[in-house]
Amino acid sequence: VHDVPVPKGGGVPVFLGSVAAMMVFLPLDGHLIAIILAGLLLVSVGVWDDASDISPILRLLVNFLAAGIVIGAGIGIAYITNPFGSGVIHLNQPQLSFNFLGEQRSIWLLADLLALLWIPFMINAVNWSSGLDGQIAGVVPIAAATIGILSFRFSADVTQWPVAIAAFSLAGAFLGYLPYSFYPQKSMPGYGGAGYAGFMLAVLAILSTTKVGTAMVVLGVPLIDAVYVGVSRI
């Protein structure tokens, strides 16, 4: 509870800062365009929600739409580590192939479905854990930097460099916002900032070789809190 009104638009500068860094250091390919568009959608709806308190159902639909944008760009959970032994479990089957505008396309049903569930879950998990001053601005840089550092372990794999750069861009944006988030807060990240943070961490976990397991370990406390909140509200 705040004694004086506190603006909730902190997600806007965080979004602009991270996107500016990514556009400077990364090629503007299909993945990055989809991430920017989905992030812009989440932040815009978040600002709208903070101002007008829109329907939770509409917010959830927007979460799935944001997930659908990046999935449509080819971002999906192609495999997961086998919890019952060594190796991985591939999720690239079954596939639904079709012709679109003269090009052969395919949908990996399991991979895309898992991503469609994982991304909205992370968006809401991070948002539900944003109740304390400085919590989001402190947790997100740690999680993003961890993904970035682990991506550097595979520096010989050139596909991991963009993941590391995007992760450090997100971490830097939230670190820059951190002084304004300490008690007493001068600004709140709001639904837009928290939703964008959860979205980016979910996507980075998918794109990195560490996959979702790393995000679940780094964000263990917020994820457990999210499950508790979800169960308590049923």
Language model: regions and residue ranges:
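Juxtamembrane non-transmembrane "cap" segments at the membrane-aqueous interface
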Residues: 232-234
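"…together with the soluble PPM/PP2C metallo-phosphatase catalytic core" -> "…together
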Residues: 1-229
